[in-house]
Amino acid sequence: TDCGMLQRIKVKQQWASVYSSGIAREDFGEAIWKAVFALAP
């Protein structure tokens, strides 16, 4: 779907918040890949 400029900024800000640095970044990345492999092993 198409996103407006405000939606793009909001998503970018949310990703920056979640995928910032350190342990939170590692935990988030690991959770994403576990979900990917669970859906398509």
UniProtKB/Swiss-Prot annotation:
Q: Which residues form the signal peptide?
A: none
Q: Which UniProt keywords apply?
A: Heme, Iron, Metal-binding, Oxygen transport, Transport
Q: What InterPro entries does the annotation carry?
A: Globin, Globin/Proto
Q: Which GO terms describe its molecular function?
A: heme binding; metal ion binding; oxygen binding; oxygen carrier activity
| Top-level lineage group | Eukaryota
Domain (Globin) ranges:
2-41
The entry assigns this protein to a family as follows: Belongs to the globin family.
Question: Subunit structure, briefly?
Answer: Giant hemoglobin is composed of four heme-containing chains (AI to AIV), and two linker chains (AV and AVI).
Q: What is this protein called?
A: Giant hemoglobin AI chain
